[in-house]
Design a protein with these regions (language model features):
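C-terminal substrate-binding/catalytic lobe of Rossmann-fold NAD(P)-dependent oxidoreductases
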Residues: 36, 47-51, 55-107, 194-195, ...
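Glycine-rich Rossmann-fold phosphate-binding loop(s) that bind the pyrophosphate
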Residues: 42
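Conserved acidic residues
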Residues: 62, 115, 138
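Rossmann-like NAD(P)-binding element
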Residues: 91-129, 142-148
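Rossmann-fold NAD(P)-binding glycine/threonine-rich loop
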Residues: 124-167
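Short alpha-helices
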Residues: 163-188
Length: 344
């Protein structure tokens, strides 16, 4: 089966399972427990997380926040998600009503009715938000944008799921760290040790963001190493990794150039590495020369062609013909859709 068919099958399986879950078992599940979820920050990541939560039988969205009345509110209304203001300021809350939206209160009001909050707000406001969540006595998850030191726990499903069970709160690591973990953790689990050097070729901004750049430059991240590689060690400390990064004028995806040093006696070949990744969820491997998918533009077109919502590609995209193991050194390229790979 080709990858195009494989991707469609994955989507169909998800849809079928959702139908089954929403069928005869739904009432039974709802009788047991429904987790009330708040989304603080209904933007690029928040709207995707909200839909993922809404698809679950044992969870419900009790509210999403916006800083001000804007076009994102229309989507929340269509989805049936109650709107709250990010702030508790009376005038800011009233602005929603003046713009024609029903606003159910401020963030404090939302936290009072939630069991857990998923924080999808911009970075650098996490510390103050965390204080509010702790005071409200609810669980919390930060969707990237914050440092491990602030949250004390980090999470990605491919690396440390069980270690995060029962904690008061955690952060989902960034899109780049998530992507690195997806392909590096299987290698580490096979080899027992791993040393990695990688370069992040980062998109300048998300497609819907008109305020960032560069638009006519290549901008190196002059903090060395960049945070992406060391962040992998917050979810899998045993992997030794460093990274550097540059931002380029595109909005589509990030690309990683990875050089991994495997231990002596690893027993792997290029083919067995590809087979290992093929067995993992959320990794798509395609041959660029055979398919014509040789750039991130075609990868995103592929995601649209298979009918993905918002044109998302939740999987990490690996070019098969860009993978080569020579002795103990593994070279490969992978592409990361920054808007969706961190979504549950």
């Amino acid at each position: 089966m080709d990858v195009f068919s494989k991707a469609n099958v994955k989507d169909e399986l998800c849809q079928n399972q959702r139908c089954v879950n929403r069928g005869s078992s739904r009432a039974y599940v709802l009788r047991i427990m429904t987790i009330k979820v708040a989304i603080n920050g209904y933007g690029t990541i928040g709207k995707r997380v909200a839909d993922a939560v809404d698809a679950q039988d044992d969870m419900e969205i009790v509210g999403v926040t916006k800083t001000r009345p804007a076009f994102g509110c229309d989507l929340a209304v269509r989805k049936g998600y109650p709107i709250f203001c990010t702030y508790d300021d009376v005038d800011r809350i009233a602005a929603f009503g003046a713009a024609g939206y029903t606003c159910h209160g401020g963030l404090s009001d939302l936290l009072e009715i939630a069991d857990i909050v998923v924080d999808c707000s911009p970075g650098k406001v996490g510390a103050s938000n965390k204080d509010k969540y702790v005071a409200a006595g609810i669980k919390w998850i930060f969707q990237g944008g914050e440092k491990h030191a602030m949250t004390e726990h980090s999470y990605t499903s491919s690396a440390n799921h069980t270690e995060n069970l029962g904690v008061a709160g955690t952060r989902v690591v960034s899109c780049n760290t998530t992507g690195l973990s997806r392909t590096l953790v299987p290698l580490y689990e096979h080899c027992g040790s791993l040393s990695v050097e990688c370069t992040m070729i980062r998109r300048a901004a998300d497609p819907g963001d008109s305020s960032k750049g560069p638009i006519n430059a290549i901008k190196p991240v002059l903090k060395v190493p960049s945070h992406h590689g060391p962040d992998v060690m917050t979810v899998k400390p045993e992997i030794q990794i460093n990274s550097m990064a540059v931002a380029v004028p595109t909005t589509l995806m990030h690309v990683h150039v990875v050089v991994a040093t495997l231990p002596e006696g690893h027993g792997l070949t290029t083919e067995s590495v590809l087979s290992m990744w093929n067995e993992r969820p959320r990794i798509v491997i395609m041959n660029g020369s055979e398919t014509g998918i040789t750039t991130t533009a075609e990868v995103m077109e592929f995601a649209r062609d298979i009918g993905r919502k918002w044109g998302d590609l939740h999987e990490i995209f690996v070019w098969e013909d860009g993978v080569k193991l020579e002795g103990n050194t593994l070279y490969y390229f992978q592409a990361i859709h920054q808007e969706s790979d961190v979504i549950p």
